[in-house]
């Protein structure tokens, strides 16, 4: 199962999930209820696992869903960090003293780059938002341009910090393929060391990447144990 939050796989505990509003929450009851082994993974980590590690042995995955998550692989393996918090890019401060994030802090990247930024004020689906972009709605075009600006800053910072390919995934990542040129131009404006954005990649799965990655990982794990 893929869950938005920091997961202790060994102990089957959600250490922290702002999205679900839980902390130190045991998941072992599911194993007891279902009477079968149940495995858990952070949703962004699972989405990263859906990508081919041979193609992206060293890469960052930006999960641009209702909330912003992230993950990254080194030498084809997920890097989880000392406390399972590696890849929490959504809670890096992007704009000091900026918008309030759902975690309670001000200026988090999530408050500027999550898919909810495009839908919450307009009370519409992402598909409807993108249709208005295509129709030339000036207000929506302005929101989209500001969104790409903030996303470009985040991407540039991650590229400078990690020097890896960056895979754009999640709901927004699934629609970005037609907007890579304007996004790339914005990214290059913030990065004085590179003259192209060939490191920006579209995700392999536009929908349900976390489900694919979770299934792929644990199927491979069990096949190796047979």
Per-region residue spans from a language model:
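Sparse recognition of residues in long alpha-helices and their boundaries
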Residues: 17, 91-92, 167, 199
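Glycine-rich phosphate-binding loop and adjoining helix at the ATP-binding site
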Residues: 5-58, 178-190
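Glycine/GP-enriched mid-protein hinge/lid loop-to-helix segment characteristic of carbohydrate kinases
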Residues: 26-29, 34-134
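Generic structural "secondary-structure junction" signal
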Residues: 8-9, 16, 22-24, 91-94, ...
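ATP-binding/phosphotransfer module of carbohydrate and carboxylate kinases, centering on a glycine-rich
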Residues: 33-36, 55, 100, 105, ...
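Short glycine-rich anion-binding loops that position phosphate/pyrophosphate groups of nucleotides
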Residues: 4-6, 66-67, 172-173
């Amino acid at each position: 199962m893929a869950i938005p939050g920091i997961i202790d796989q060994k102990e089957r505990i959600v250490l922290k999930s702002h999205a679900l509003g839980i902390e130190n929450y045991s998941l072992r009851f599911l194993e007891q209820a279902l009477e079968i082994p149940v495995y858990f993974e952070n949703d962004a980590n699972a989405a990263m696992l859906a990508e081919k590690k041979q193609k992206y042995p060293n890469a960052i995955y930006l999960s641009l869903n209702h909330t912003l998550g992230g993950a990254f692989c080194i030498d084809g393996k997920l890097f989880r960090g000392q406390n399972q918090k590696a890849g929490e890019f959504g809670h890096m401060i992007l704009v000091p003293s900026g918008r309030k994030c759902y975690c309670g802090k001000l200026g988090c990247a999530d408050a500027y780059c999550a898919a909810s930024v495009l839908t919450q004020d307009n009370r519409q689906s992402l598909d409807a938002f993108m249709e208005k972009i295509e129709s030339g709605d000036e207000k929506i075009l302005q929101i989209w341009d500001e969104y790409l600006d903030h996303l470009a800053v985040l991407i540039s910072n991650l590229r400078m910090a990690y020097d890896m390919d960056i895979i754009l995934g999640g709901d927004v990542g699934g629609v970005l393929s037609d907007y890579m040129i304007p996004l790339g131009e914005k990214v290059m404006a913030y990065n004085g060391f590179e003259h192209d954005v060939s490191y920006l990649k579209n995700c392999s799965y536009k929908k349900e990447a976390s489900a694919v990655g979770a299934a792929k990982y644990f199927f491979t794990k069990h096949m190796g144990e047979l």
